[in-house]
Amino acid sequence: MNSRLDYYNASPKAMKAMIAMEALTRDLSIEPALLNLIKIRASQLNGCAFCTDMHSVDARRFGETDRRLYAVVVWRDSGFFSPRERAALAWTEAVTLLAESHVPDDVYALARAQFSEGELVDLTMAVSTINSWNRLAVSFRQAPGG
């Protein structure tokens, strides 16, 4: 599949803003290993092969195991994830699939049990940012590894 256009060259100003948002997510309170997991899960849900690939590679660089990476897609049925990671993955799914059910109260309660108010805002910003990246990459058919 060929990319439809190079969005970095097509709108440098817009991409500068996206890069600034991405940089911000790295400075928030969510640990890098968890950020990679939520980026992978949101990218899977959005059908973004480019971002799923990129963040899986990043996760391995941070020491993530292949076994856990393979299980992200079925995290609910896997014992590989901590309560904090499970809460973050549930929150990621709810925020990513917002139009389906908004964010259910039980998902919010699970997230609040694991994250402070500030951390939950930070997590939501990270989920929002990866969703924006996914929409760019999917819309313009950015190929994995490219």
Where are the language model's segments positioned?
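Hydrophobic alpha-helical segments
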Residues: M1-G146
